[in-house]
């Protein structure tokens, strides 16, 4: 009877990536297979996020539900990872006695060892340290699950925005060596991946070591990835405006594999609030980045993050945010009502904006961005869009689902053979959350460029010594 693993994930794409690596790790080294049903699992892992309001209480509520399963099965192992575990490890241990393992984002690679410690009778094994880049050296080779893949290129953040817990839960910025990233993407491309999304809390701050002792910038890494045959689309998230340098903007001018869509969080359009947030830039500097981006890539579309009701935010401050939204013409946003995060400098500020006022401002902001997004979508009517076919349509499994460069879902009638490849479709209808397309041509009728085959990169790295032990070298 196979051993079962259940993982519940909350939060950002980095957490989704980490959870997939936990599954790979425990599958590779201990033979666990994933299950959607917590009731049939031998191990339950909760990968937590501390960004949202009442994150800690949400964790304890979930653990309370899992405790009933452990009462029935004392051999069940329960682990808590992610940012809440990193921040509140001792509190979790003291309050939730059903928890066996507590680990941080940088120590998930030690899960097999921690599980063995529990099997030997140890109680509440905790490791929320920050061993920098060690975890990437201990993870199994990547496994593709469809034509798109996330690849983590760096961890942590050193910006210390006044509202944010990330530097305290994931540590400061640490970049992976560039050769390791290129090798991982080449391995994914060999398995059929066509689009990669490069991940980091502050991804454009990437400065990775090269094999010859140099430093690879984020702009250089983008060009290296674009040269890998089979990788025809590159996305990245999340960026910080103060690291969005001209060399990155230049990549948009000469690298078509980099999509015409960018998520660049700004949080507020008020210079006064941006200063209180310790963002390190003003609204005019943000608009300067967007202006230069649109000069390099005229059709690029921008999404952002907004925090509504930050301490001290006046109606005039909110009006500045709405003015920025109009000036930039954002296509999408993730917008939230401010709530204090324990341990951050902003938590000491008086939360003096009325909750009803916050809700009204949030509704106004979201309504405006929805209008702008629909305007962009309507402009796509009648155009031919190249989409990457990801699988069957969610609502109608007899149809296919793909995604445009500007991150819109398109449903269309097509043959299953197109899954995992690019097709051109004409946009024939527009909905709030998706588009309707008509199939025009398949990939066999396109002229997709070929530069550097993944097998060339793998061969370059792979070397067998006299004993037949495989090593990977630059």
Swiss-Prot record:
User: Which residue ranges does the record assign to the Radical SAM core domain?
Assistant: 143-375
> In which compartments does the protein localize?
Cytoplasm
- Assembly, per entry: Monomer.
What Pfam family is a match, any one? UPF0004
Do the record's keywords include tRNA processing? Answer: yes
* Name under which the protein is recorded: tRNA-2-methylthio-N(6)-dimethylallyladenosine synthase
Cite the PROSITE patterns for this sequence: MTTASE_N, MTTASE_RADICAL, RADICAL_SAM, TRAM
Catalytic activity, reaction form: N(6)-dimethylallyladenosine(37) in tRNA + (sulfur carrier)-SH + AH2 + 2 S-adenosyl-L-methionine = 2-methylsulfanyl-N(6)-dimethylallyladenosine(37) in tRNA + (sulfur carrier)-H + 5'-deoxyadenosine + L-methionine + A + S-adenosyl-L-homocysteine + 2 H(+)
Naturally occurring in which organism (per UniProt): Shewanella sp. (strain MR-4)
Which molecular function terms from Gene Ontology are attached?
4 iron, 4 sulfur cluster binding; metal ion binding; N6-isopentenyladenosine methylthiotransferase activity
Domain named MTTase N-terminal is located at 3-120
């Amino acid at each position: 009877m196979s051993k079962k693993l259940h993982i519940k994930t909350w939060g950002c794409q980095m957490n989704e990536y980490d959870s997939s690596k936990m599954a790979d790790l425990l599958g590779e080294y201990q033979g666990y297979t994933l299950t959607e049903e917590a009731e049939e699992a031998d191990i339950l892992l909760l990968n937590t996020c501390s960004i949202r309001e009442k994150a800690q209480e949400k964790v304890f509520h979930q653990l309370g539900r899992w405790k009933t399963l452990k009462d029935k099965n004392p051999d069940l192992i329960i682990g808590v990872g992610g940012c809440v575990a990193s921040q509140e490890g001792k509190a979790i241990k003291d309050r939730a006695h059903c928890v066996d393992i507590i680990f941080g984002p940088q120590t998930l690679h030690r899960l097999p060892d921690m599980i063995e410690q529990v099997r030997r009778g140890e109680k509440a094994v905790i490791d929320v340290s920050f061993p920098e880049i060690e975890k990437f050296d201990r993870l199994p080779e990547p496994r593709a699950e469809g034509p798109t893949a996330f690849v983590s290129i760096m961890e942590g953040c050193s910006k210390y925005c006044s509202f944010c817990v990330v530097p305290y839960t994931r540590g400061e910025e640490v970049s992976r060596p560039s050769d390791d990233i290129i090798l991982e993407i080449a391995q994914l491309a060999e398995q059929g991946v066509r689009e990669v999304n490069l991940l980091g809390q502050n991804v454009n701050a990437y400065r990775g070591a090269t094999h010859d002792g140099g430093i690879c910038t984020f702009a250089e890494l983008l060009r290296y990835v674009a040269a890998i045959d089979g990788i025809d689309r590159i996305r990245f998230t999340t960026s910080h405006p103060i690291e969005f340098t001209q060399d990155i903007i230049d990549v948009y001018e000469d690298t078509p594999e980099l999509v015409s869509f960018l998520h660049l969080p700004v949080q507020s359009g008020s210079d006064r609030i941006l200063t209180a947030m310790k963002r390190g830039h003003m609204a005019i500097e943000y608009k300067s980045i967007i202006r230069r981006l649109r000069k390099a890539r005229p059709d690029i579309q921008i999404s952002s993050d907004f925090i509504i009701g930050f301490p001290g935010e006046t109606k005039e401050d909110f009006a500045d945010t709405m003015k920025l939204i109009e000036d930039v013409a954002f296509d999408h946003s993730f917008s939230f009502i401010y709530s204090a995060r324990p341990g951050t400098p902003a938590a000491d500020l008086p939360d003096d904006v009325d909750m009803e006022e916050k809700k009204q401002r949030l509704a106004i902001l979201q309504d405006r961005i929805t209008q702008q997004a629909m305007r962009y979508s309507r402009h796509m009517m009648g155009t031919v869009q190249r989409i990457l076919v990801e699988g069957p349509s969610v609502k109608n499994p007899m149809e296919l689902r793909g995604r445009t460069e500007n991150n819109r879902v398109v449903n269309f009638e097509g043959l299953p053979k197109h899954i995992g490849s690019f097709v051109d479709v004409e946009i024939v209808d527009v909905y709030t959350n998706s588009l309707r397309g008509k199939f025009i041509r398949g990939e066999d009728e396109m002229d997709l460029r070929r530069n550097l085959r993944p097998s060339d990169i793998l061969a370059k790295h792979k070397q067998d010594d006299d004993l037949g032990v495989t090593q990977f070298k630059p």
